[in-house]
C-alpha cells in the first residue's frame, strides 16, 4: 500500500531552511523527477478512499498538487480546476490570502460557483495555512467540499481544518528531522 511513495519519502534528502528541516521530494518539489508510476499509485489509492461519484470538479493548488490531481482527472474524466498564484481578472474570480510556514501570498479561484461539489487534492499539509484559506473561501462561495486529500502530512496544521468541519485524509504522515524522513502513519492503517 503506497510502497513507492513510502520508499521515496524515506529516501528523501533533508536540508535546513533556517531552523526548519525541509524534505525534498518529487511530489512536493518536483525534484528529483516525478515517477509516473508513483503518481499512478497515489491516484489509485485516492480513488479507493473517496466517493468520486459525488464530485463535479477536482480542485488543486498551483503548483505541486497538479501532477496527482491531473492523474485523477485523467482516470475519472472529471474536470480539473487549479487555484492559481496570479489573477486573471475574470468575472467571479475570488482572491484569498494564504500563509504557510515559509511563505505568504495571494491565490485566485476561478470557474467555481455555488453548489459545485469538489475534492481538494494537495501535495503537502504542514501548517495548514493554504488549505485553511482555501476551505474558508470555498465555503463563502457556497462550494460543497466532498473531501480534502493531502498526499503528505507533517505537523499539526490539519487540526485547524477539523475546526472548520473538514476531516482531511492524509495519505502518509511523516516526521522530518536532521536524520531524515520517518513514516508515522498511512491512511487506512490507523
Curated annotation (Swiss-Prot):
It is an enzyme of class 2 (transferase). The keyword Glycosyltransferase applies. Keywords: Cytoplasm, Glycosyltransferase, Purine salvage, Transferase. It catalyses: IMP + diphosphate = hypoxanthine + 5-phospho-alpha-D-ribose 1-diphosphate; GMP + diphosphate = guanine + 5-phospho-alpha-D-ribose 1-diphosphate. It is found in: Cytoplasm. GO terms for biological process: IMP salvage; purine ribonucleoside salvage. One of its GO terms (cellular component) is cytoplasm. SUPFAM superfamilies: PRTase-like (SSF53271). Belongs to the purine/pyrimidine phosphoribosyltransferase family. Archaeal HPRT subfamily. Catalyzes a salvage reaction resulting in the formation of IMP that is energically less costly than de novo synthesis. This is Hypoxanthine/guanine phosphoribosyltransferase. It comes from Methanosarcina barkeri (strain Fusaro / DSM 804).
Amino acid at each position: 500500500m503506497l510502497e513507492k511513495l513510502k520508499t521515496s519519502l524515506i529516501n528523501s534528502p533533508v536540508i535546513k531552511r533556517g531552523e526548519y528541516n525541509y524534505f525534498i521530494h518529487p511530489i512536493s518539489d518536483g525534484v528529483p523527477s516525478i515517477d509516473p508510476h508513483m503518481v499512478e499509485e497515489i491516484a489509485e489509492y485516492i480513488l479507493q478512499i473517496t466517493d468520486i461519484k459525488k464530485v463535479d470538479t477536482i480542485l488543486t493548488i498551483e503548483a505541486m498538487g497538479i501532477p496527482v490531481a491531473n492523474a485523477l482527472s485523467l482516470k475519472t474524466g472529471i474536470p480539473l480546476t487549479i487555484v492559481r498564484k496570479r489573477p486573471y481578472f475574470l468575472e467571479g474570480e475570488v482572491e484569498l490570502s494564504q500563509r504557510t510556514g515559509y511563505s505568504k501570498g495571494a491565490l485566485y479561484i476561478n470557474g467555481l460557483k455555488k453548489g459545485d461539489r469538489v475534492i481538494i487534492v494537495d501535495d503537502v499539509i504542514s501548517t495548514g495555512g493554504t488549505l485553511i484559506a482555501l476551505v474558508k473561501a470555498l465555503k463563502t462561495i457556497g462550494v460543497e467540499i466532498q473531501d480534502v486529500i493531502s498526499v503528505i502530512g507533517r505537523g499539526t496544521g490539519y487540526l485547524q481544518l477539523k475546526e472548520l468541519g473538514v476531516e482531511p485524509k492524509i495519505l502518509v504522515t511523516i516526521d522530518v528531522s536532521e536524520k531524515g524522513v520517518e513514516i508515522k502513519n498511512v491512511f487506512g492503517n490507523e
